[in-house]
Amino acid sequence: MKPTDKIVNVSHSSHLCHWQGGAFACGKRGIYMSRNTDLSLFFEPKSVAVIGSLREGYFGGYVVIKTLLNAGFKGKIFPVNPSYQEVLGLKVYPSLKDISEKIDLVFLIINRRSVPDMMRTCADKRIKAVIVVADGFAERDEEGAKLQNEILKIAKQAGMRIIGPNTAGVANPTNGFIPDPYEMGYRTLKTGGIAICAQTGMINPQAFPYGDLHYGVSKICDYGNKCDVDECDMLEYLENDRHTKVITMYLESIRDGRRFLEVSKRVAPKKPVLILKSGRTKEGARVSTSHTGSLAVDDQIFGAACKQAGIIRLEKFSELFELPKIFDAQPPPRGGRLGIVTFTGGVGVLAIDEAAKYGLSVSKLSPETSAKLNAIFPDLGKTIVDIGPPMAVIDNYMDIYSKILKTVLEDDTMDCLFNVIWTSPFESFVEEYLKFYRKIKGKYQRTIATWIYGPSVPLVQEMSSRMEDLGFPVFPDLETSIKALGIAYQYAIRKKGGA
């Protein structure tokens, strides 16, 4: 359905955006001044000042310092609080003015009314990056909105950048910079190629078990109220970040429609950009305003903008932590021909139905491959390679499993593989599977999405975890597995200029 021509404000002060001739267009209403988008001080600081409560607990400046030390941060840490002399073995300074050394980044975990004066002190110290963890700003009331405007004005005049307010901050596991203001419950994150940014602290380490998920992170950023640093700034920063392969975002609003479209069009062909946007309904849009002080974007127009820019739009919160893995851990699909190896024919048929949604077609195995499979077990060389029948009657099943998978992966008629594994109730099977997957890691240029199931939840979890460690992304169900392959295929087509 073609969206009707409609005007919607996608910014507090910048542009009016609408549909015009089948494209996302913006007309100026004031000018949003794009400032320095080199955000390296937020993710690669050499020195950090932490201003706020240093009382031991599950939240506050004490926890920021503790998580930095636990993660192995190599830079200098300057705790600031007039009531302390030492914390966690570090000297505490009475005020920011008492620190003679250069400070790259400041954390403000203080009462909202104290933030403007502290921002002025930061300006006097020529500090260029501030993370305002404190809440109670535009998301709360009129006084908070005025305070937010005040700190933004101070920052602009001083050439400072702000993340927040009302934020859980950032993380960069590639260098041990994980300054979480909340107690995490684990020491560090798995380093990988996924950058995840959001208007919620739900993506920060204290809220999600990244260590258990084997979700390889390059950067994390909670925008908070995004009074300054926003989605466009992060897209531009991550565009050239050598650690980031795929960019994932949760957004409640778009501040500058014109800039968002321009930046997305430039970044998306280089790196996949996956976005989940809330506020799809009128009620959801209303509530998002009270959450971060956002001004919601018309969902239909946002969807059209994503399509125009080449952004992959996510449907569920869980997909933020599932679908990006296919881009981080696997090579891009060479084409849309899908191979299926399963333990039951029913799963294979369901997979074919799902695949059609994304333009994937089931691979027809070559006569040579079919003959090889039929030699392993009668009638095995079909479109859906069903391993269930041989498993039921062959004593040395694990011996032939490797032959079956190798034969399928060597077939040139297949570009990507939906790989279904049944763990069995026996731990010995898991070890045999893993022995095989270690041998084939990186050997075949096929995009592989794996779904693991079985009668023992602990065994399924163990094998899933160890497969992820080997670089084979495991998904929670059939549908998500096929969707991962589907969006990877669609992105590959667009990158080649075919869409």
Predicted regions and their residues:
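Catalytic-core regions of core metabolic enzymes
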Residues: 26-499
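N-terminal leader/targeting segments
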Residues: 3-6, 35
